[in-house]
Amino acid sequence: MSPPVSVTKMQVENYAFAPTVNPAGSTNTLFLAGAGHRGLEIEGKFVKFTAIGVYLEESAIPFLAEKWKGKTPQELTDSVEFFRDVVTGPFEKFTRVTMILPLTGKQYSEKVAENCVAHWKGIGTYTDDEGRAIEKFLDVFRSETFPPGASIMFTQSPLGLLTISFAKDDSVTGTANAVIENKQLSEAVLESIIGKHGVSPAAKCSVAERVAELLKKSYAEEASVFGKPETEKSTIPVIGV
């Protein structure tokens, strides 16, 4: 067996993102694929609203390696297809959105819902099922408020389940506040952050940089194991340091 790949924690503003997590809605350990802020230019000043961490199940590494090993961080950053593979790949994802500035659940959920519906209608995939899923999504957030340091967390199952959790501190464990079964909505949350029109270019670049390095390491280790064929998938576990 190849030696484990280690991933490090990251700091975004005053908020730390652990190298690995065991989130609500999952029995697996997911590793930190990248982190960054979300902000907007307001009256000539860039204002940061949230710090975002993106975690992936370790099976993401061999899956992504099939197409993306050997690519540079810049090549991955510039590739819409790479981020689509991250969003839609057959492995779990976990996204933690931590408030830098206060935000109400209504403000957050309405913006996410608006972007999702516009995208689905634009590509012709909006149905009654998506409409019902959006209503459930809005209901979950309706009475919530998120002060600085509070987090919204999403666990995305490849089966199409979206587990939503809230925390007032840096905890990522505990019980789920809601589970919504809709594959398009499940994928849309992460897509809205690191996809083609993602709201966090910083998180997007971070994911590209860290995944490129993990693919590089896994490929080098795979090739060095007693003539192991290049096409054989790696089963390298990911641990935190």
Curated annotation (Swiss-Prot):
Induction: By UV light. One of its GO terms (biological process) is flavonoid biosynthetic process. SUPFAM superfamilies: Chalcone isomerase (SSF54626). This is Chalcone--flavanone isomerase A. InterPro entries: CFI (IPR044164), Chalcone_isomerase (IPR016087), Chalcone_isomerase_3-sand (IPR016088), Chalcone_isomerase_bundle_sf (IPR016089), Chalcone_isomerase_sf (IPR036298). It is an enzyme of class 5 (isomerase). Belongs to the chalcone isomerase family. It comes from Petunia hybrida. It catalyses: a chalcone = a flavanone.
